[in-house]
């Protein structure tokens, strides 16, 4: 039996580009649509506009400041999105 490695493991990669319309096929935002904002090739992840929203709580640095809550889109693995043909 042949051992599977990255070199002999074959799968079809999607050709995603910035600005493509995609649909989420897995996760909390399933069946939602959005456009690709950024692609992280080293991790095989994409950032989709308006999808996978996360919050980051920031403590005040000085005594006269107030804390903040930043909202941002977290990356999604490319296997969880499907390109929509227009």
Swiss-Prot record:
GO biological process: translation
Any single GO CC term annotated in Swiss-Prot or TrEMBL for this entry: ribosome
InterPro entries in alphabetical order: KOW, Rib_uL2_dom2, Ribosomal_uL24, Ribosomal_uL24_CS, Ribosomal_uL24_KOW, Translation_prot_SH3-like_sf
PROSITE patterns given in the database record: RIBOSOMAL_L24 (PS01108)
Taxonomic superkingdom: Eukaryota
Entry GO MF terms: rRNA binding; structural constituent of ribosome
Localization, UniProt: Plastid, Chloroplast
Record flagged with keyword Lyase: no
One Pfam family in the UniProt entry: ribosomal_L24
Keywords attached to this entry: Chloroplast, Plastid, Ribonucleoprotein, Ribosomal protein, RNA-binding, rRNA-binding
Summary of subunit composition and partner proteins: Part of the 50S ribosomal subunit.
Main function: One of two assembly initiator proteins, it binds directly to the 5'-end of the 23S rRNA, where it nucleates assembly of the 50S subunit.
Similarity field: Belongs to the universal ribosomal protein uL24 family.
Protein name (Swiss-Prot/TrEMBL): Large ribosomal subunit protein uL24c
Lineage: Eukaryota, Sar, Stramenopiles, Ochrophyta, Raphidophyceae
């Amino acid at each position: 039996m042949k051992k599977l490695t990255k070199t002999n493991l074959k799968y079809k990669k999607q050709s995603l580009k910035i600005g493509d319309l995609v649909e989420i096929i897995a996760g909390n935002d399933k069946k939602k649509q959005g456009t690709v904002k950024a692609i992280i090739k080293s991790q095989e992840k994409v950032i989709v506009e308006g999808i996978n929203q996360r919050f980051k709580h920031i403590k005040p640095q000085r005594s006269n400041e107030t804390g903040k809550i930043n909202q941002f889109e977290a990356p999604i693995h490319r296997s969880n999105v499907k390109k929509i043909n227009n």
